Amino acid sequence: MRHILMISAALTALASGAQAQDAEVREVVVTGRAQQLYRTQEAQAGRLPTPPLDSSQAIQVINAELIADQGARDAQDLYRSISGVSFFSYAGVTARGFRQEEIFFDGLRGDPYAGFSVPQLFNVERVEFLKGPAGMLYGPGAPGGLFNYVTKKPDEAFSARVAAVVGTEARYGASAEVTGALPVEGVSGRLGAFYEEQNTPRVNARSEILILDGGLKIELPLGELNLQATHYDQNLPGNRLRGVPTNNLGEFLTDRRWNHNEPGDFLRLEASVVQASWAAQVGDSLTLNAAVRYTEGLETQKYHEPFGLRDTNGDGVFDTSLRQYRDQIRDQSNWSAGANLIWAFDLAGVESRLLAGADWFTNELAFESRGVNGTLAVSPTAPTPLSLFNPVYGVTPISSYRLPAYTLSLTESDRAGGYLLYEATVGNLIGTVGARYDSFKDVSGAASFEDDALTWRAGLVYRVRPDVSIYGQWAQSFEPQGASSQTPLAGGPFAPTEGEMFEAGLKSELMGGRLQGSAAVYHITRTNILQADPRGDVGGDGTNDLLAFGEITSKGAEFDLAADITADWVLTASYAYNDTRITADNGRTAITNSVGDRFANAPEHTVGFWTRYQFPDLGLAVALGGDYVDVRRSMSDQKVRPYLVFDASIIYTRGPWRALVRIDNLTDEVYAASGFIDRTGHFPGDPRSVFLELSRRW
């Protein structure tokens, strides 16, 4: 509550100073508002600005309007809008069949959420998902694509917004943001603050999130300089959350709100980011940009890990979970930098563009950990077992656990890359060819591992007619394993992941752009992919082990549609088919998947849609969304059942005021959002929830 009072006090002066501008505020919802509502032609993720129909890469953009209409708070609210993307765990997703966790901010590495917290959207202007072989532009990464979060920047024009939210699960919060020109010529500023607190659906679990964000934009004699600083504070009592145990048919063995954590367990993240970016246009043919980003974060996790299921009464049904207490501290800092040059020129009469760029990333992590295993018998010095049906918490105080001293693990990761991409246009043909050189070095304790690689990409686009194009592309991929994966405690070191990808597709902007669609087919082969060992911490050293597969092949098709059905009715829809399988075994048998089995958490079919209809004369709009995810297999080869979930929004706008009612999981479906391993269970989807957000703009 104190954070809300602070935000309200800070906005008092703003509100009084903005009264003179009220007369300039017009209705937000007007006739024709739906047309182009969710469209964004601009995207940073492609590096080389190109109209969608002229590009052999597919970029899906979730813009501010769609984020606002959905009342989206974090990245998980947006996955339905991107074909081929579904939830895996925490901030990770399945993209074109592969697990993908790394994300970018304004085109740079430096994730403040550290992998166990989901990115929040308060200071995000739009979310871009670059499909396919993004590694040629961004360096090593999963070939299914990558997320780029474009943050909010200062604007010369004054605007401000204040909002308050209340909802089920004891939810309440407030936010405020303001931007405009400062008294210094050529300088604009932005300030923002967000606070929200709520119970989360699992027993003992809560969420408290604070984000403070500020920035300056400075017009220079050559170009524009943006300076930004952001602080994140997430306090998650009753976390870190694992899943709820299931049987092999994917049915929960207990209530979806069951939690393996004690009331005193928690996950706490404090992170700060500073960033500077510069961009300039030199004449008509040369574009330059450069950026640097520094991130530091401290994440503390003290929680009870499910350590094994037991049938204590002999009826053939698991009824108790053994637990391991884990005390972990991750202190991390990293630097990221990148620069690009785009030169437009004629080469022997051929319209040409050349992109040259380089990037660099270094990360240091100090990981302190300790833990103690519980047993089936109640012990005064170790975690007690927890019933799945009648859990009793607090039997043994954590303060009485016999914990060993902390084990300290120091890792340092360095990445560097340079790339060239050449584009040539001859009539209706547009061809691209590019190469990238990558090098990396990981140091973990006394062990060191380094390597490099040269990878290639080529693409071709043919403009069948002004509103239709077909394209194809080929790319190689190269992805070093994470530094923490190289530790012998996890079974490392491991060789890098390598792969090859082919993609072809069609793009269109029919009916004067009112009907925009795309279709793609792809084939991806990757080797030496790491996956969690279902046996968990094999050596009892406090670190879960990993295993490497031989070869994984992913084949699929994707369809995306954005349509202005009428002047007041808009629809976005996506469908994806994927077949990801283990096509060559590396000889290890610890994982139950065998050659030909489906890969973990890779659904065969996914469907998502979001549709919005407005009543301009009433200032009212209603929206409905749906998300279908097909059957999957967990990492322990347990079934993860398919689900269909609906969400809805009602938006009422009157002058500068806006009210949003958001209903998640409209039918209160009980489902698993994804699978993990059998001892930790499947991640349950959230039950039905409702919130009201009231906001005012100046």
What are the roles of these predicted feature ranges?
Residues 627-633, 651-698:
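C-terminal beta-signal and adjacent terminal beta-strands/loops
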Residues 25-157, 504:
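Acidic, small-polar-rich N-terminal luminal/periplasmic segments of exported/outer-membrane proteins
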Residues 428, 547-635, 670, 693-697:
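Gram-negative outer-membrane beta-barrel transporters
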Residues 219, 332, 351-363, 370, ...:
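Structural signature of Gram-negative outer-membrane beta-barrels, strongest in the C-terminal barrel
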Residues 159-161, 166-239, 264-281:
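Transmembrane beta-barrel wall of Gram-negative outer-membrane proteins
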Residues 274-297, 324-446:
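Face-selective signature of the C-terminal outer-membrane beta-barrel domain
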Residues 277-293, 297-305, 470, 497-586:
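Membrane-embedded beta-barrel scaffold of Gram-negative outer-membrane proteins
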Residues 186-189, 222-227, 285-288, 349, ...:
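Repeated loop/turn-to-beta-strand initiation elements of outer-membrane beta-barrel proteins
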